[in-house]
Design a protein with these regions (language model features):
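Short glycine/threonine-rich beta-strand-turn micro-motifs
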Residues: 21-24, 28-62, 80-115
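Short proline/glycine- and acidic-rich turn/helix-capping motifs at secondary-structure junctions
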Residues: 51-68, 125-136
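Intrinsically disordered, low-complexity Pro/Gly/Ser/Thr-rich segments with frequent PxxP/GP/PP motifs
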Residues: 197-224
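A mature extracytoplasmic/lumenal domain signature
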Residues: 58, 103-107, 170, 178-180, ...
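Bacterial signal peptide processing site
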Residues: 11-14
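A short tyrosine-centered beta-strand micro-motif
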Residues: 212, 227-237
Length: 273
């Protein structure tokens, strides 16, 4: 399997878990002299004709490599800023008889933008969750003299980033990196994982006792427009002398406001359930 990551980071290797084979979701439809690429997860009403014969195409390794090279060139010059594809592609590579494109959120809108703005080919198969996965995990924001807080208690729901502060009031040096996770509570009160790109730079930071660390997290609103409500930010640190890993979590809010505020009590009124 040949693999190339469009965004290189710590999680840059594809999963090799023994999962059931996934049927190709790319197929070619011939309508007269025109060949059209479709997706099995897109409903039949989105197709150009009412009835057609769909057949999986098989490509050689050499053909896939040529398509992959062309994909890199087209992606580099594609105009996807502000679309559902912006920040959504985590990688691509040859897998079996197809060129697989991994999406943070494998939505019909993202696939449509890819075909229009980047490449439309029956060789391409899209992988990734079709909806945000449930995630009700919780951790503390304060332990052993280590504290994690949002810089502001509320950010505009249209914001692309949120900032967080890590305070080290312990007697230990703590190590940390770029990786983080975010979950959100939807309108039904169910917590789900926010679809963000989890390819992070492999860098490390040392926070000495008595120091603090300010960092930024991307909210990826182009992939899935965020709603006003409650969000959780997860961040792992390590006591360097003890090699002890600690997962921290802090809550923050997105609200219908123009600028971030430190006290959200007067600007937020969100009903859940």
């Amino acid at each position: 399997m040949s693999w190339v990551w469009l965004l290189v980071g710590c999680s840059g290797k594809p999963s090799r878990n023994n999962q059931p084979a996934v049927k190709s979701d790319s197929a070619s439809i011939t309508q007269g002299a025109q060949t059209i690429s479709v997706h099995a997860q897109d409903t039949i009403c989105h197709l150009p004709v009412a009835t057609q014969s769909v057949k999986d195409s098989v490509f050689t390794e050499q053909e896939l490599q040529k398509i992959q090279n062309e994909l890199r060139k087209r992606y580099a010059r594609s105009e996807i800023e502000g679309t559902r594809l912006d920040g959504n592609i985590s990688g691509s590579g040859i897998k079996g008889n197809h060129l697989v494109v991994n999406l943070c959120l494998n939505s019909p809108e993202a696939r449509a933008v890819f075909r229009k703005k980047v490449m439309d080919s029956p060789a391409i198969r899209f992988e990734g969750p079709i909806e945000p996965t449930p995630n009700n995990q919780r951790y503390t924001s304060d332990t052993l003299g280590i504290h994690l807080y949002p810089e502001f208690s509320a950010y505009p729901y249209t914001a692309h980033t949120a900032t967080f502060v890590l305070f080290n009031q312990s007697e230990h040096e703590i190590g940390c990196g770029d990786p983080y996770r975010i979950t959100y509570e939807n309108q039904h009160g169910v917590w789900r994982t926010l679809p963000i790109n989890t390819n992070f730079h492999c860098v490390g930071y040392i926070i000495k006792p008595g120091k603090q660390f300010l960092f930024k997290a991307h909210l990826n609103p182009n992939v899935l427009p965020n709603r006003p409500g409650r969000y959780r930010f997860f961040y792992e640190v390590e006591l360097t002398d003890k090699k002890q890993k600690i997962m921290l979590m802090t809550e923050f809010r997105l609200a219908d406001i123009k600028e971030a505020v430190r006290d959200s009590s007067d600007v937020i009124s969100v009903e859940y359930r």
